[in-house]
Structure formats: C-alpha cells, structure tokens
C-alpha cells in the first residue's frame, strides 16, 4: 500500500499476465437474446477467458442492480422499449465449471435518456455487433467472495 495525495492506495491482491489469442468479430441475429447469444458464441468456441464489447440496439432489456448491503441482486429495471446499445463491456471466465459472461451495459432511448447496469438475460436483439477478445493464459475462475457476496475471480 502507498499514499497518494492523502488517499490510501492498495496494490492489487493478484494480477495475472495474459496475451491475445483469438479475436471473434460478428453480429447476433434478430431477436436473439443478447447475453445468451454472446455466451453461446463463447461456449461453442471454448473461450474460457476474455473480453467482450457490443454495440447495436435491443427491443427491450433487463438490468440488474446489486445491493451491497444485502449482498444480492435486489433491483431490476425492466425496459420495454427500443434502445440503443451505447456500450456493452464485459468479461469471460469460468463459474461453477461453466463458461460465464459477466457484462454491464449502457442503453439510451429515443430521447437520449440513458440506463445502465448489470445485463440480465432477456434483452431481445434488434441489431448487435460484437467483438470478443480471447485471452491466452491461466483460466479465470469465479468463486463467492465472502466480503461482497459476489462470485469474483479467485486468481
């Protein structure tokens, strides 16, 4: 740890070195589930560790909110309208031995109002272009972290 302008700065508890392996670029189909579609691509291609980015539009969406006090996803925003995907970013790792995609998204409606949060299953794709960067190195595994209640990387 060190101090930076009066603030305590912690060093990472663990850092792993990765190198790019493969890059997948494509689009999801009309009415595909946004999260399910990306997850399916990762599972089909055996992508165990990586980064995802998506832009496009959805016909609806469901965003999760993690209540830090309750250590649970307690609030979900259900958006039953057409939305632009301004940004979708996430990572790929293993959770309970399965390939797992964790993604957050920022969406905007026709007036420019934005919504953001944890992407939940159920967002129906209108158009979605994805970029998936597979990483070469130690597989990332998620395990429940007792201090947050979240399944976080263990390595």
Label each region the model flagged.
Residues 1-101, 106-155:
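N-terminal intrinsically disordered, cationic/polar leader segments
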């Amino acid at each position: 740890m060190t101090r930076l302008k009066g603030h305590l700065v912690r060093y990472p508890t663990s850092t792993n070195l990765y190198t790019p392996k493969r890059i997948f670029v494509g689009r999801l189909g009309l009415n595909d589930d946004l999260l399910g579609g990306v997850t399916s691509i990762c599972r089909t291609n055996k992508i165990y560790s990586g980064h995802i980015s998506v832009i496009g539009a959805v016909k609806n969406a469901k965003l999760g909110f993690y209540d830090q006090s309750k250590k649970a996803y307690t609030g979900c925003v259900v958006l039953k309208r057409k939305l632009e995907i301004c940004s979708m970013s996430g990572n790929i790792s293993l959770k309970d031995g399965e390939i797992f995609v964790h993604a957050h998204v920022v969406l905007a409606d026709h007036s420019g109002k934005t919504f953001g949060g944890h992407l939940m299953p159920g967002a129906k794709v209108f158009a979605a272009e994805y970029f998936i960067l597979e990483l070469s190195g130690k597989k990332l595994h998620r395990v429940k972290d007792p201090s947050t209640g979240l399944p976080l990387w263990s390595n």
